[in-house]
Amino acid sequence: MDELRKLVWDGKINVQIAVNPQLLVKGINEKDVTVNLRIPRNAYLMNYIDEILNDLRKFLITDINFEELDGMFWFAYEGIPLYWNYPFGALYDSMVGIDPSIRYDQMKQCNSMMNIWKLQLNYSKEYPSGMIPIVDRVNQIQKYWMHQWKQACFVLNGTSKQVMSLSLVHSQQFWKSILMRDYITFYKIALKIIPSKPRHIPLMIHLTFPEIQIIQPICKFEDDSGNPQTLKDMLMTELPDIFSVDETPIAKVVSHGIEIPFDMPLFALYERFLSCDAFLHLSICMVTDDEMKRNKV
């Protein structure tokens, strides 16, 4: 389990950040202004905003006051705003799964074998609908992250005291383990919070069809017969229109870029694939026509 956890923790995504042309100094070609970087799946995109802005600052219009912002920087994928409060890998898995057959064809036609997620940096005084405003940069992200851990701790244990009782030193070490990509420290503290037999499992299901939405079901550790609940059990209960006993699945479940087998016990999946915010993020992605044909064989 430790080896798989480490692989999940080390996962990164190649990203290219372009800039909304309206933010560029007159005369600058938008195609000439990009930032390329690798962002960990197990991190928040906005943790990298300062690094991105440092590379772009000289190309941006002077109307933007970087010290006393009266607006907000945010990112979009093909015009769709990306909510910063979800781990980056979960955003990627769900957003590129909107129409995988088209994206698969696009990748086949690409000369490069490297998959790069192309995003756009935007700035506005009014926030996109549903997006949590950021007014305190990294400090606010840290507070939100700790809130998520308290919520997940309550789901797991029926109380948040395991998180609330962390010393200030351990709380700071916990947060810094994400910023510094310190796998050992992260799990050393996380495993003090996660019980061997939880009451429920912290879970977020990311759907992009028929509309973008997040579902947070109440998932028991065991079914009514005392058997560990599997991924399939949960899906048939929460998403019966997509996953049923008799029909070939029209979608697949992806976490950290890995397609998850339906028969995997849900808590075993959580132990191996939980994200930095203590939740198990599952992205529901439509299967391609070719995949549907293979599944029926």
From Swiss-Prot:
Family matches, as Pfam families: ATG5_HBR (PF20637), ATG5_UblA (PF20638), ATG5_UblB (PF04106)
PTM characteristics: Conjugated to ATG12; which is essential for autophagy.
UniProtKB keywords: Autophagy, Isopeptide bond, Membrane, Protein transport, Transport, Ubl conjugation
GO function term, MF aspect, one: Atg8-family ligase activity
Function, in words: Involved in cytoplasm to vacuole transport (Cvt) and autophagic vesicle formation. Autophagy is essential for maintenance of amino acid levels and protein synthesis under nitrogen starvation. Required for selective autophagic degradation of the nucleus (nucleophagy). Also required for mitophagy, which eliminates defective or superfluous mitochondria in order to fulfill cellular energy requirements and prevent excess ROS production.
Family: Belongs to the ATG5 family.
Protein name: Autophagy protein 5
